[in-house]
Amino acid sequence: MPRPTGKKFDKRRQQQNPLFKRKKFCRFTAAGVDQIDYKDTETLKDFIGENGKITPARLTGTKAHYQRQLDTAIKRARFLALLPYTDQHKA
């Protein structure tokens, strides 16, 4: 069976994946970071979701080496009350 080409193939491809996915890259590798600091709360907040969970590497594009450091840094910052455990404390 011949491979589909032309406009039909392009339409079919767009229908399968309607959202454009940007190529993921590791922010820490690009910046040349050696160690992730637990005191840098602004950077750490970017990797915490709305519900307070740590965003996985498959969504952020962070390399495994830095994801482990990020996990430890967030947990340390939470323990020292630099970051909240949850996003909103509702009474």
UniProtKB/Swiss-Prot annotation:
Swiss-Prot/TrEMBL keywords: Ribonucleoprotein, Ribosomal protein, RNA-binding, rRNA-binding
Listed Pfam families: Ribosomal_S18 (PF01084)
Any one of the GO CC terms: cytosolic small ribosomal subunit
GO biological process: translation
Protein's UniProt keywords contain Ribosomal protein: yes
InterPro entries the UniProt entry points to: Ribosomal_bS18 (IPR001648), Ribosomal_bS18_CS (IPR018275), Ribosomal_bS18_sf (IPR036870)
SS bond list: none
Record-linked SUPFAM superfamilies: Ribosomal protein S18
GO terms assigned for molecular function: small ribosomal subunit rRNA binding; structural constituent of ribosome
Protein family membership: Belongs to the bacterial ribosomal protein bS18 family.
NCBIfam families in the cross-refs: S18
Subunit structure: Part of the 30S ribosomal subunit. Forms a tight heterodimer with protein bS6.
Job of this protein: Binds as a heterodimer with protein bS6 to the central domain of the 16S rRNA, where it helps stabilize the platform of the 30S subunit.
Designated name of the protein: Small ribosomal subunit protein bS18
Species assigned in the record: Burkholderia ambifaria (strain MC40-6)
